[in-house]
Amino acid sequence: MPPDWDTDSPELRQNLAGLLESIKQDARQRKQPTVETARRWQSEIMRNLQADDPKYVGAFRGETGSEDVQVHVNWIFDVAAPEVGDALGEFEQRLKSAVAYLDNFVPPGAEPNADQIAVIIDVCAWAHAEWVRIHPFANGNGRTARLWANSLAMRYGLPPFVGLRPRPKGGYELAGEKAMRGDWAPTAAAFRQMLDEFQNELGPAT
């Protein structure tokens, strides 16, 4: 039997590793981000895993078969299923606007400076936190949110500093709870720390 879709299994880690490599290529080409991109990510994350119900794979809440799916994080409830479609539309519009600005602010192939990194981190944090707030899938929202953050980071010359599995520690969990309430500032603070730790582990460039 395939491992459960929530289990930290070798199959899940393999799916995430392969997906991150694909996302890296898309990021380098600066492909236009869409919510359909994340739908594909969630489907690939769940490949060869046992879902509670197969209809939840690759489906946004509120769509056929998921009309009544409601989820919460520590009893903080997310966007209601009938409102997910509109929330995703607004998310995509705002993300495209942010990316259009950053595409000009950070030239392709350039190493971002401190001011640029600050803006990149903010956009990564906003996208991650807003995805967590909407919680568009029945499962896999945290993983896809972290993929959004890494996709944007790699698009602008930063490493994929947000761990995919296991879930990051430190202030990440509390930041997620704040994100459910619409506050993405704690996520930005957690991401700045993660990036510093990631770069410290790599050591100085030679």
Task: Please identify what each model-predicted range represents.
Residues 1-139, 143-206:
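FIC/Doc superfamily catalytic core
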